[in-house]
Each structure stands twice: as structure tokens, then as C-alpha cells.
Amino acid sequence: VIENVADFGEYGEENTGESEIFQVVEDMPSFPGGNVSKWIAKNVKYPVLAMENGIQGKVFIQFVIERDGSITDVKVARGVDASLDKEAVRVVQSMPKWKPGKQIGKPVRVAYTLPINFQLSNN
């Protein structure tokens, strides 16, 4: 039986979970004002070349909401087209700070996936 085994980080200090990224937490992160979809719709710029070529679809962006609410590690989880993927990353990187997620009352890092829909209107 092994007891009292601590998780030690790279330099020998005990890992307090500060670098751990959670998928689900007691209090999930929230976007300021609550409506991230509305904010994205207002701030996304449809790439001209994609528009001219009728390219549309849903880009899934993964990122980490840090303990201070900032956004890091932004990457495309599932892309559509290079220009749409690039714009989706840009708009996520430009988001304001979120209210961070909490576990046991303390702010923690939380992984988040956000779908961004690029759809051309039929005008």
C-alpha cells in the first residue's frame, strides 16, 4: 500500500493543480454579458475570398480560459477552410476576459470548445 504520494512538478515542487486544465468544473466560465454568440456575430469579419467562393461552414475553436479569465492556447479543433479558420481564431483571441471557472471556490483553468458558424445569406 502506497500512502502520501505527492505529485511533483518539473522542478521538484509539489503540483498544486495550478497548471491543470479542467474540462468540467463546479462553476463553469461565463462570457461577460452572457451572450458569446451575439458578440461573435457582431465581431466576426467574413473573409472576402471565402464569400466570393461561397465557402461556408462551422469552425470549432478550442481554447483555455485562464484563472484570470483571459483566453490562451487558441486552436482550430475542426476547420472548414484556411480563411474561415484564421478568422475564427482571430475573433476568439480578441474576446474580452471571461468570468473564470471555479473548482472548490478557486479560479481554475478550463478548456472550452466554441463553434463559429460562417453562413452566407441568400440575398
PLM feature spans:
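Charge-biased low-complexity segments
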Residues: 1-123
